[in-house]
Amino acid sequence: MADYWRKQQPGQPLYGDILWSRPERRDQAGRLTIIGGNSHGFSAVASAYQLARQLGVGEVRAVIPDALGAKLPTAVRHQLDDLILAPSNPSGGLALGAERDLAVAADWSNNLLFIGDNGANAETAKLLERFLTNQAHQGARVTLARDTIDLLVYSAEALLARENCHLVLSLAQLQKLARAVYYPRVITFSQGVKQIAETLHKFTISYQIVITLFHDDNLLVAGEGEV
């Protein structure tokens, strides 16, 4: 096995010291803001919120379009301890006017999860690009998932150059990003986990992001050339 590739054994933590040092008190377990949803979809935000609470995140906040807020059942609202309704556009997604809410969220938690369900919305794509490339927010740690990646393909160069950025994506989305930046290595679905691991090794040397990718029944996490 290549020296950059560390493989976890079944039933054993790969980094035991991190696992055992998790905070036991909720007030010491950090803050997380979950961002996403549109007037026709909320499941990704709701699922991520519930999972974050189950895993012991100290404080969790959700930012969703105000067009969606009116459609939330009362029972769902009561499950969300901290809910921000940000400006939405006519299509029901987050509007450019939501940038202030994202900035406040970044100041509050410094950990932002863009969970998706954005819809194929050009204005939301512009909002995300503007926020993620704004130098004032470069210190915020961001995780991008699901259709958030698709919205930002045309901003791939700036996205991959961002510090503190974690992409949770599919192999198809990795292909799109690689093509968008003219990455010289071919990525195909027929490649085995060893070839994909080598690609992630080289890709995360070229770009300072962290990538999480599920392929061929293996979950791979890569950053700074380590897989």
Regions found by a protein language model. Name each.
Residues 1-27:
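Positively charged, low-complexity intrinsically disordered leader regions
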Residues 5-6, 65-227:
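Glycine-rich phosphate/dinucleotide-binding loop and adjoining beta-alpha-beta core of small-molecule
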Residues 10, 34-36, 186-187:
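Short, contiguous strand/loop micro-motifs
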Residues 14-17, 34, 113, 159:
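Generic, low-specificity signal for short hydrophobic/alpha-helical stretches with a mild N-terminal bias
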Residues 15-16, 40-44, 93-98:
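Short secondary-structure boundary/capping elements
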Residues 19, 44-47, 101, 127:
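Well-ordered alpha-helical segments embedded in enzymatic catalytic cores
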Residues 11, 30-31, 152-154:
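Generic signal for short, ordered secondary-structure residues
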Residues 21-87:
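Substrate-binding N-lobe of the ribokinase-like
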